[in-house]
Amino acid sequence: MALPSSSLSSRIPTGPHPLTHTQCIPHFSTTINAGISAAKPRSFYLRWGKDSQPKNLGSNKIIACVGEGTTSLPYQSAEKTDSLSAPTLVKREFPPGFWKDHVIDSLTSSHKVSAAEEKRIETLISDIKNIFRSMGYGETNPSAYDTAWVARIPAVDGSEQPEFPETLEWILQNQLKDGSWGEGFYFLAYDRILATLACMITLTLWRTGETQIRKGIEFFKTQAGKIEDEADSHRPSGFEIVFPAMLKEAKVLGLDLPYELSFIKQIIEKREAKLERLPTNILYALPTTLLYSLEGLQEIVDWQKIIKLQSKDGSFLTSPASTAAVFMRTGNKKCLEFLNFVLKKFGNHVPCHYPLDLFERLWAVDTVERLGIDRHFKEEIKDALDYVYSHWDERGIGWARENPVPDIDDTAMGLRILRLHGYNVSSDVLKTFRDENGEFFCFLGQTQRGVTDMLNVNRCSHVAFPGETIMQEAKLCTERYLRNALEDVGAFDKWALKKNIRGEVEYALKYPWHRSMPRLEARSYIEHYGPNDVWLGKTMYMMPYISNEKYLELAKLDFNHVQSLHQKELRDLRRWWKSSGFSDLKFTRERVTEIYFSAASFIFEPEFATCRYVYTKMSIFTVILDDLYDAHGTLDNLNLFSEGVKRWDLSLVDRMPQDMKICFTVLYNTVNEIAVEGRKRQGRDVLGYIRNVLEILLAAHTKEAEWSATRYVPSFDEYIENASVSISLGTVVLISALFTGEILTDDVLSKIGRGSRFLQLMDLTGRLVNDTKTYQAERGQGEVASAVQCYMKDHPEISEEEALKHVYTVMENALDELNREFVNNREVPDSCRRLVFETARIMQWFYMEGDGFTVSHEMEIKEHVKNCLFQPVA
């Protein structure tokens, strides 16, 4: 793709989309300044090397270090210099390309996808489709704790039997070998002790299971002390409320437990302190998370008042335990209906909360998207999101559709995913979770928050639209929290026990939304994703439709399959580069691998192979043309080259130097080939369209060449106006768009064309991020125009640091606007919208820390290229 070394651009005009040839080309003067020979070179550049650093000798001189000697050149800060003698051209050299054939051969995997693997991919896709299609109220595992509370309920007919005898039997049959109750594959002392205590009390109340009780007591005595070694962040929700209350009950029942353990005393003290701070009027005023733990508040609850806060489904915040406690106190029929509803689903046990329908759908969609396999499930994803959106609330959502207490975790996840899929959702929903100090918390009016929910808020904050200050506040707040969490091992995590949440946080902070690419995120998340992750509610629970081995298996097979296709395409493109004679061009950069990587990082799907070829070839041309017009060609020769493109006349190459002859001939032949294929795809001739796109680019390069020749520093606005073309990104995108699998009408092309705000923002953000990382080096090479320098010219009173800050502000605001264009431009096919938006993102990624295009081999970028293109996932 086009990643020019010279700087150009800032504010882009927003006029209507021109369609005709004469309308499309901006009016760029090709008249050479009177005092300058058009046949002489226009600029000087430093040789590449550690000793070739520019030395500033004041406002009027720059010395270029070239070999053993130096070249002193006048530096003019005036707008134009009419009598400037042409400076001597010093050959510019780039660092050599890292990706030589032997390097690529040593990295390329010999693995080929077998027929059995292809069959397995098909099977997994079918299985996962069935997972999505079977989503109802949520799939989850049994909660021994909640089942014990439901088993307590006496028969409503007055007999001395449990209302749900099957739950009592489940407790008797599901004690673990160590005497505890809970999930056997994962030991969390908090969870096991809580569930074991609840089951022992229930068995004691029904005077059954003496053997199980005895084993449970033994477990409690030997293992309870381990709680002191566990992080506070692993303490289940409401533990300090329900555990002391049950201990008190156990003591009354005569269970022989170590009530004097220090941690037990500490938990009791925490409960008392919390209840002292609890205004009773709040308990009944509106739904809060206290409804989730009413079984631990029985001595203070006014049961008639609390009934007013019952959910529509009859539950109390979807908790079977809390609902069972209310039923035993009130006999409320809706409570009983809810419990019957849950048992009808699960048979002889209940989960820790139910339903989980919104949570399940959102996280399943997020999982397949982050793993890079979402393209296989477009219909299923739409159905899931339609369901979530139908239950969206401007106050936020919780984990279930009728949950009266919204949480920031589900709300932020929903806001981000729904917005990116084109649903109309407002960021104002986050205001529900912001306190008077500007801090964000998981639940309204509480101070609880964890790493996972703050991570989701942070991810959400990056899809902001212009003017959404709440998103900016959320970004700053969560970045601060997450960076502190990385320094505090105990901060991981209040709501989930994940395989590598730390790795997820590190990736999100280093590669936020505008600096991450789909293929890179997939590679990273494949490593971080845990198919056996568990969540923490009142007890530990699992979500098999979110954490599932099948997702991971498909992601790995699919990644490696696509990677093998990419390796073949890259070999083809490298052969094309060599056969074209480009290796003989010493004035330009050989970056075939980096350019192909930029395309494969986002348009990676097998069906877009032709688009990747075109994107890569056109990007290579724009780099060559940029280097040609930027420093190598004389103005006479450049005008001849531009005339050749305008006339589309191969005979003009006879008047060109050899290097230009190579460039023009290969451009001519390649564009003709692309046009033939484009005609097949679009059903109409596209050669004129492609030539027009190229003419516009060369006109912009010509203007830039004139600026360089005359040492002219344009105003910020003038600089930006030309940058909408000279950045070259639009050239690549507008031609590649013809191969995205859609028939593009003139109307659609206008919505991504030169006059569209969408394309302008892509160009603007790409140019500005380039300038922020290259302007100093290019200034040392004699370049006089960049966003920073032009803004300083307009505002001579400001410092360079202030100018740079302004450029960053313009860019960040433009990225927010780009979000809005990407999301709302629904008349443009998805593949075309992606092409524009992801091209903007790859620029942010390449220039995140420096000039990652020119010197990628010296940066972390090299490892990402390896991971994306060469190293299969295990």
Swiss-Prot record:
Which purpose does this protein serve, as stated in its record? Terpene synthase (TPS) involved in the biosynthesis of diterpene natural products included in conifer oleoresin secretions and volatile emissions; these compounds contribute to biotic and abiotic stress defense against herbivores and pathogens. Catalyzes the conversion of (+)-copalyl diphosphate ((+)-CPP) to isopimaradiene.
**Compartments reported by the entry:** Plastid, Chloroplast
Keyword field contains Nucleus: no
Q: What is this protein called?
A: Isopimaradiene synthase, chloroplastic
Origin species, per record, is: Picea sitchensis
Gene3D superfamilies per the record?
Answer: 1.50.10.160, Farnesyl Diphosphate Synthase (1.10.600.10), Terpene synthase, N-terminal domain (1.50.10.130)
Pfam families linked to this entry:
Terpene_synth, Terpene_synth_C
Where can the motif DXDD motif be found? 407-410
Q: Where is this motif: DDXXD motif?
A: 626-630
Name the cofactor(s). Mg(2+); Mn(2+)
- Binding of Mg(2+) 1, residues: 626, 630
